[in-house]
Amino acid sequence: MVQIPQNPLILVDGSSYLYRAYHAFPPLTNSAGEPTGAMYGVLNMLRSLIMQYKPTHAAVVFDAKGKTFRDELFEHYKSHRPPMPDDLRAQIEPLHAMVKAMGLPLLAVSGVEADDVIGTLAREAEKAGRPVLISTGDKDMAQLVTPNITLINTMTNTILGPEEVVNKYGVPPELIIDFLALMGDSSDNIPGVPGVGEKTAQALLQGLGGLDTLYAEPEKIAGLSFRGAKTMAAKLEQNKEVAYLSYQLATIKTDVELELTCEQLEVQQPAAEELLGLFKKYEFKRWTADVEAGKWLQAKGAKPAAKPQETSVADEAPEVTATVISYDNYVTILDEETLKAWIAKLEKAPVFAFDTETDSLDNISANLVGLSFAIEPGVAAYIPVAHDYLDAPDQISRERALELLKPLLEDEKALKVGQNLKYDRGILANYGIELRGIAFDTMLESYILNSVAGRHDMDSLAERWLKHKTITFEEIAGKGKNQLTFNQIALEEAGRYAAEDADVTLQLHLKMWPDLQKHKGPLNVFENIEMPLVPVLSRIERNGVKIDPKVLHNHSEELTLRLAELEKKAHEIAGEEFNLSSTKQLQTILFEKQGIKPLKKTPGGAPSTSEEVLEELALDYPLPKVILEYRGLAKLKSTYTDKLPLMINPKTGRVHTSYHQAVTATGRLSSTDPNLQNIPVRNEEGRRIRQAFIAPEDYVIVSADYSQIELRIMAHLSRDKGLLTAFAEGKDIHRATAAEVFGLPLETVTSEQRRSAKAINFGLIYGMSAFGLARQLNIPRKEAQKYMDLYFERYPGVLEYMERTRAQAKEQGYVETLDGRRLYLPDIKSSNGARRAAAERAAINAPMQGTAADIIKRAMIAVDAWLQAEQPRVRMIMQVHDELVFEVHKDDVDAVAKQIHQLMENCTRLDVPLLVEVGSGENWDQAH
């Protein structure tokens, strides 16, 4: 590690930091509308730097106005850069004034760039025996590094001495100019030699030396071991003029004529009154207070009155980072020494981004192809371990790479950020590595910030938060049947793609995390529910569930016969044969030949045959009823009875569903492959499918299900005395509701009245209208309205809750669960009545459904912790709606069921008791 000597000359690349701060910070303004974000970023960096190193001599160097000698050498130099934004230009003059008021010398020299001024001062100081610390984010400055000249990037806290330059760029400081001349520099529009990238440039320079040597001994190039070595000499010769032009453009001048010497760059005492006026004008309130208290700076060359004080960007502005993604500092690691050096960096990083690359999306069967890491914006590494295409270079073996990385990956204190880390955790588990230190998941950060703002995949988030279009997998792998798997992709493309994944993930975290920290409720959900749930879901997925394919096969054969019967019945009703699965043919039969009046139309103008429409038509016509039954059975057959046996993993003999935390608006989990949530709950067909979910030998299935959880949450949220009393006394809530609504003694309530009350109870949770209730109960609308009016008379707290929630939603634009999860409702003030009504229904339902989701997630976390600590023989194998399903050894059933029951009922406190019903059996149906 580089040791910074005492009292170095500090040279700050002001222009570099000005642009980086502009892109890193949000567009902050003061109350007068004047931009302040870039100023804030630069000043924050300067203050931290001066307070940390306490120099007696320093300078902040900016580019001067006008052209430089490089523009005369090459007319396209930096020509691709857009003009300086007006809101950045407006900050330059006040920033200069603040820098000077801080007591720091400020330099800008016409005809050259800030780099040249810094290079000249650095060499002068070195000759005088003074150590130099250059604060910059530009890679071309690496050419200035010597044992006495060090670079520091204060935005990422990265320090580069000679050894670190080699580790980062693959060449020593004295070859950095040659390195840039060969590969070019897209940020400055330095052309370089066409076809020479980072790896080729490194191979040339490491093999033979600098540009002069390459052109003096071209015959030796063909003997180097890199792709394209045999033709490289000719390519260099063809582009010799461009190479040497690039060399000139990349060379930092160290002989600029300056009016000041290093010894004259003394740090002065801050001009407190001037600083105070500027800070007040631009409303840097925290710093205003610091200046007034005499504790703005503490440097040896000045006399501030107080001890240094730590500051954080988060004190006044979101701690965000650059939105410009550059591939210049991505490396592909092919040797152990470089990997060990990177591991050392990762171990010191406060947090790092991490990603895996594989040959399949199925994390149970997938093989690890490589890993990528990022420790600072723009700096990332890819470690390939299994690329096996023709002529692929030698790589560190998968076993050796994981052996070296395992301590870091399993270190709880090494905080990791990823995008959908549940997948990466599963991949590593295939190789016996338990991923720990899972601190941040950008998919979940986005989801918790706003579940309905858009998609939460990395590509979408990069466009939304970073304004960056990522490299897509299709771009490097192709499409369709000829698509390559990741192990077949050339390292040059694979390395950039994989490193970008880690880099973008880190930058997304740095953008979103400050926003999340501002909101107590969402932050609580993220830290205490969603992130702890990641390893729990990963374990459930890996546990999988045992399926009996014979049960499903028999069921499928029965469904085939029943579908044939329904098809025959439909043909008889229609008076002709037609394809029941054809929407077009069904439209013709129903609305043309049978003369049924269409209820709705599709966006294309055709009469709708949706499930909702058919349900309404089925009240009056026989054919829609048959079609509905046919569709339901056909879906069960294709989705479950036929498909589930094909989903059995040959490696494990079990079915492994995938759970998704960031899909539903309200926080409910969803699942795919298979979708467990869509298995019918209350009919015989659903029971038959559940019978195929079986326990292995000597084990039984245990199911634990929250009873009427959303109604209990409604009672808690509404504080309605009638509901609270009914639940507290353990009454049948639907019978109790019927007694209240119909004014009857509890014991005289009929099953039909209970059914009506149940429809009201559950309907209100989902914001059902009188029209919807009428349709469900098949009664006149007026009668349904009467039932609802009676309900609200008997349970006035519920009506008050609904009205209060609607009002809060309109005022805030969102509603919250008990834990603070938010559901934003963009249509709550819509001029479109249907959209507004849907948003109002969602406003009423979301706090209940979302709170139920939070409760079962808390239960999963609590139960999993107990299982991991005390019950290794018990497996949690499924989560479906409000139910958790386990495999339990037959000798442990009673004790385990009792503890699960207790943990689930006590994971959250409501004003009404939570009730958990636990059952067991040889299969899921028996347990359920």
Swiss-Prot record:
Residues 521-928 are annotated as: Polymerase. Residues 324-517 form the 3'-5' exonuclease domain. It is an enzyme of class 2 (transferase). The keyword Membrane does not apply. Its EC number is 2.7.7.7. It catalyses: DNA(n) + a 2'-deoxyribonucleoside 5'-triphosphate = DNA(n+1) + diphosphate. PROSITE patterns: DNA_POLYMERASE_A (PS00447). Pfam families: 5_3_exonuc (PF01367), 5_3_exonuc_N (PF02739), DNA_pol_A (PF00476), DNA_pol_A_exo1 (PF01612). Residues 1-323 form the 5'-3' exonuclease domain. GO terms for molecular function: 3'-5' exonuclease activity; 5'-3' exonuclease activity; DNA binding; DNA-directed DNA polymerase activity. Residues 324-928 are annotated as: Klenow fragment. GO terms for cellular component: cytoplasm; cytosol. One of its GO terms (biological process) is DNA-templated DNA replication. Keywords: DNA damage, DNA repair, DNA replication, DNA-binding, DNA-directed DNA polymerase, Exonuclease, Hydrolase, Nuclease, Nucleotidyltransferase, Transferase. PANTHER family: DNA POLYMERASE I (PTHR10133), DNA POLYMERASE NU (PTHR10133:SF27). In addition to polymerase activity, this DNA polymerase exhibits 3'-5' and 5'-3' exonuclease activity. It is able to utilize nicked circular duplex DNA as a template and can unwind the parental DNA strand from its template. Single-chain monomer with multiple functions. Belongs to the DNA polymerase type-A family. NCBIfam families: pola, PRK05755.1. This is DNA polymerase I. The gene is polA.
